[in-house]
Design a protein with these regions (language model features):
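Rossmann-like dinucleotide-binding domain for NAD(H)/NADP(H)
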Residues: 2, 6, 11-104
């Protein structure tokens, strides 16, 4: 991972919202500390909760790393969209309409 971070532009922002284990956190922390990339945003980590000795927790500059453990989806807009979709699905059901049909 460290070599990949070194190939990125120094202005790069690394975002991981998919799978924690795909990132070598020690390499990410090193790349951030050395300025190889600008910043990172993580919604998933290799081990959750993040261990107290994680190198990510040692990063002093808070502008370099944002960690949102599985809460990045929880903006007010995202929650409102969930409510809107559920409401529309219930209304469609009450009207006898098919909605979001998945066929194999």
């Amino acid at each position: 991972n460290y070599d990949a971070f070194c190939r990125m532009k120094e202005s790069a922002y690394f975002i991981n919202v998919g799978r924690g284990p795909i990132v070598v956190e020690e390499d990410l922390a090193k790349a951030l500390e050395e300025g190889q990339i600008r910043a990172a945003g993580l919604d998933v980590m290799r081990i959750e909760p993040l261990p107290i000795d994680s190198p990510l927790l040692k990063i002093q500059d808070s502008s370099k790393l944002i960690i949102t453990p599985h809460t990045a989806w929880a903006t007010s807009e995202a929650r409102q969209r969930c409510v809107d979709v559920v409401t529309e699905n219930i209304k469609a059901f009450l009207r006898g309409e098919d909605k979001n049909i998945v066929r194999g």
